[in-house]
């Protein structure tokens, strides 16, 4: 029996080398940037906006924090967390996606080009790092998780909103919609059926809730847990970087 292609060398159901995977994914987001948010509305019937608001409530942004929204794209999640009394930064490898967000004039949001596997951030410099619907596009998810752990302050929190594995009774309907409707919407709205075929296939290749939680724990995070949304169609994983140890005799 053939072993499944590692995620780092898969573009949806296709086997490619890591370099080719990175290039293809960047081309996908460059091609769909202008219609990305509209497609999300159509594909999810607008429910992704409710998921993101729930996600931001879980992130609980506070005054004085440095918050990074990784793979933040057009900045819709960052805009929900932004305020004058905190620093919110979108880090994304796609300049085209960020340009769409910058044109919208989101207040109190900074923008920085960077990849999840090599974050342009100092060690222990971030209070909260969020990522929504982006971690499965990282070529080396294990490396990305270690990088996220590196840049978080002790006690800092990582929150990831991602498509996941829905309840068994929902899967036949979910699969029918995903493989028939979504690529057609991609062709009609974004003129990019290939991009949305990749989207659907990449979701199926991504680990389920328990499997991804294990990856987060393996990267060094503590108190890892998850919360299903819409019967598991999407899921929020949360992990914490361990707080700094108190030196003996100082308590």
From Swiss-Prot:
Keywords: Menaquinone biosynthesis, Methyltransferase, S-adenosyl-L-methionine, Transferase, Ubiquinone biosynthesis. CDD domains: AdoMet_MTases (cd02440). Pathway: Quinol/quinone metabolism; menaquinone biosynthesis; menaquinol from 1,4-dihydroxy-2-naphthoate: step 2/2; Cofactor biosynthesis; ubiquinone biosynthesis. It comes from the Bacteria. PROSITE patterns: SAM_MT_UBIE, UBIE_1, UBIE_2. S-adenosyl-L-methionine binds at residues 74, 92, 132. InterPro entries: SAM-dependent_MTases_sf, UbiE/COQ5_MeTrFase, UbiE/COQ5_MeTrFase_CS. One of its GO terms (molecular function) is demethylmenaquinone methyltransferase activity. Its EC number is 2.1.1.163, 2.1.1.201. The keyword Methyltransferase applies. It catalyses: a 2-demethylmenaquinol + S-adenosyl-L-methionine = a menaquinol + S-adenosyl-L-homocysteine + H(+); a 2-methoxy-6-(all-trans-polyprenyl)benzene-1,4-diol + S-adenosyl-L-methionine = a 5-methoxy-2-methyl-3-(all-trans-polyprenyl)benzene-1,4-diol + S-adenosyl-L-homocysteine + H(+). One of its GO terms (biological process) is menaquinone biosynthetic process. The keyword Transmembrane helix does not apply. Methyltransferase required for the conversion of demethylmenaquinol (DMKH2) to menaquinol (MKH2) and the conversion of 2-polyprenyl-6-methoxy-1,4-benzoquinol (DDMQH2) to 2-polyprenyl-3-methyl-6-methoxy-1,4-benzoquinol (DMQH2). Belongs to the class I-like SAM-binding methyltransferase superfamily. MenG/UbiE family. This is Ubiquinone/menaquinone biosynthesis C-methyltransferase UbiE. It comes from Rubrivivax gelatinosus (strain NBRC 100245 / IL144).
